[in-house]
Amino acid sequence: MTFNEKTVLITGGAGFIGSNFVNHIYKKYAKYKIILLDALTYAGNLDNLLPEMKQSDRFRFFHGNVMHGDIVKELVAQSQIVIHFAAESHVTRSIYDNTLFFETDVIGTQMLANAVAHHPVERFIHISSSEVYGTAETDPMDENHPLKPLSPYAAAKAGADRLVYSYIQTYQIPGIIVRPFNNYGPYQHIEKAIPNFIISALQDQPLTL
């Protein structure tokens, strides 16, 4: 198998960031096969994906949750690269339904990391969040900034982040942890800050911070 013939498992690939990434690698790597696992919550939409992808033999979609260990193990075993976007990702929602966040973000990540530990892959990329840092104590912030999450969502992401790190140390999984700061782009849900600001501005409403 050459570099251009990988099978990539992407969780949460129908969401905002995940779908942009799926579309990108589908176009850039013509021989990559893509397996997409997504629960299709309110934030996931298969219409975010390129129309031609859905008819391609390079693409397979599985409707499921990362907490479902059996399907996760099955799909990881078929993959060389695993990229984990799937998560509940809204600070305010996490305040009112924090159980869902800890189940999806922490237990779901554990299921995936367990599968990677048992079915070795070439790379496991975990998408964390800058929310794990809390309020900035240094300028600029870097990876050495202490983790001080300020919401249930941030705490769940911090838990998943440290879980993956522990698996890198304990089981030597080939993991990378990415902590993106505020993202903006196509397919972003209107509950997020920048789309909300744009809609408010178009309606001549005040921009509430």
What is the predicted role of each segment?
Residues 158, 183-196, 203-205, 209:
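Glycine/proline-rich active-site loop of Rossmann-fold NAD(P)-dependent oxidoreductases
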Residues 1-183:
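N-terminal Rossmann-like NAD(P)+-binding domain of SDR-like oxidoreductases, especially those catalyzing
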Residues 55-57, 171-174, 198-209:
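A short C-terminal helix-loop "cap" of Rossmann-like NAD(P)-dependent dehydrogenase/epimerase domains
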